[in-house]
Design a protein with these regions (language model features):
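Membrane-interface amphipathic segments in extracytoplasmic regions
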Residues: 2, 31-457
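Small-residue-biased low-complexity repeat regions
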Residues: 5-6, 21
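Intrinsic disorder/low-complexity segments
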Residues: 6-8, 28
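Plant-biased recognition of short, low-complexity, intrinsically disordered N-terminal tails
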Residues: 20, 27-30
């Protein structure tokens, strides 16, 4: 796993990085000593055998007379990690889904948890589509009445702490996710090329051309302009057009984010982020298993960003760059506090559990497919434009039986899952309210009385 410049140097660990993950490091070499004489070896072997018999007899005696249980020691090289504090799972979560940061995958994890535990998820009113009328500031008025009061919220919105606190339970845990600004901006430029006016103006849809003179294309007052400038700051409720030379603005925004969110995840270290999330919420490892969603096809991705272009992206999105640098550093401080060896061991356990789940659902690692090749329309991801292709997954053909709901939801895209939850929760809301009361009969209308006056002539 590569690390950006903000990652601290690695600590000594029984794990070492390899292509595709972490593997156990080899044990240290044993020092060589001269062989013992044969007679000494025989005496040593007898003593060892006698000692083993005594230990075995003592253990059996304890088991028979005291009902003791065997306690197996941890495997050699495994980190000694403290057990989490006992307590119930947290059942109220507000996730600020930022743009192009692996937020769709986090959202899917939260949707599945809420559905399994019969918890209400706040969903947008139909005029807002599957987002809470973004890019407007969030308002509780945008929440569908059949999804109130909610325990979870995880769809796109522009953060407003006061409105969310008014909507969500008092014990809600607030989390969000950030991504390295260069990779994020390249993804934004490709994904929203036909939506953001600043991107549409660029000749040949060239990111390098845009960055040569971004002010020539960018108009702050236009709809969807925020995709072209400091999008993370905008999503978090900040002023994405604030002068980065103001030395007081970014530290103030950082303090607000730290006060609002119990955890800021980092997309580049997604599995480590899920370990911290699981611990924060006191969830099980199975609660945070996932398959990557809303990915671009290889031909829709850039071939990497040249160093000069990367510097231009950071300069143009200076507020986002400063925000990410701060929370990347605090993220690794949390990892170190939790014990890096322990976190990496849990990452390995998470990946092994995920592999078992996808093996059960797909018979192996699922292969991303273009939407046109996915048979089940409920699994076809939304396509933002003809210029970019978003891939999804299809379940393997079965025996005609309905697909396993657990596997279906694991790869269900955001739009379809949101609509499914809205239908399900609307039905539940109507059942709770009961049938509508019968209509009250209106006043009885008498026929008009015949007039005794002569007709006008």
């Amino acid at each position: 796993m590569g690390a950006p410049g903000g990652r601290p140097p690695p600590l000594p660990s029984p794990w070492r990085p390899e292509q595709g993950g972490w593997v156990a490091a080899p044990p240290p070499a044993m020092a060589c000593t001269a062989p013992a004489p044969p007679r000494a070896l025989k005496m040593l072997s007898r003593r060892r055998a006698l000692l083993l018999l005594l230990l075995l007899g003592s253990s059996l005696s304890l088991l028979l007379h005291r009902g003791a249980h065997l306690s197996w020691p941890p495997k050699s090289g495994a980190p000694a990690c403290p057990s989490p504090a006992p307590g119930p799972k947290r059942m109220a979560v507000a996730f600020l889904k930022t743009h192009k940061t692996a937020g769709s995958t986090v959202q899917n994890i939260l949707f599945r948890f809420a559905e399994r535990h019969n918890l209400t998820v706040a969903l947008p009113h139909p005029p807002c589509d599957h987002q809470f009328c973004y890019p407007r500031d969030f308002s509780a008025r945008y929440v569908h009445p059949h999804t109130r009061p909610p325990a979870f919220i995880a769809s796109h919105l522009r953060f407003r702490a006061a409105e969310l606190h008014r909507l969500m339970p008092n014990d809600t845990v607030y989390v969000t996710i950030l991504r390295e600004p260069v990779a994020m901006f390249e993804s934004l430029f490709t994904y929203y090329n036909q939506y953001c006016p600043a991107f549409r103006r660029v000749p040949n849809a060239s990111l390098a051309t845009f960055l040569e003179e971004p002010r020539a294309y960018y108009r702050p007052q236009e709809k969807y302009a925020m995709y072209a400038h400091n999008t993370l700051v905008y999503d978090l409720g900040g002023d994405n057009d604030h002068d980065p030379a103001d030395a007081t603005y970014l530290p103030g925004l950082i303090r607000q984010v730290e006060d609002a969110f119990a955890l800021v995840m980092i997309a580049e270290y997604f599995d480590e982020s899920l370990v911290l999330l699981r611990r924060l919420l006191n969830w099980d490892l199975d609660d945070v298993l996932y398959v990557k969603l809303n990915m671009r096809a290889p031909q829709s991705r850039g071939n990497g960003t040249a160093p000069g272009v990367a510097a231009q992206v950071r300069a143009w999105n200076a507020l986002d760059a400063g925000l990410y640098a701060h929370f990347n550093a605090t993220f690794w401080a949390r990892i170190n506090h939790a014990g890096r060896d322990c976190v990496e061991a849990e990452v390995q356990a998470l990946r092994a559990a995920r592999d078992r789940l996808v093996g059960t659902c797909f018979g192996g690692r699922p292969q991303p497919r273009p939407a046109t090749q996915i048979r089940n329309k409920e699994l076809r991801p939304w396509q933002p434009s003809a210029q970019v292709e978003i891939v999804g997954y299809d379940l393997p053909p079965g025996s005609g039986a309905p697909p396993d709901p657990r596997c279906l939801k694991l790869v269900m895209p955001e739009v379809q899952y949101s609509r499914y939850l809205l239908r399900k929760q609307s039905l539940r809301s109507r059942r709770r309210r009961g049938p509508p009361p019968p209509a009250r009969p209106g006043p009885r209308l008498l026929p008009p009385r015949r007039s005794l006056l002569p007709k006008a002539t």
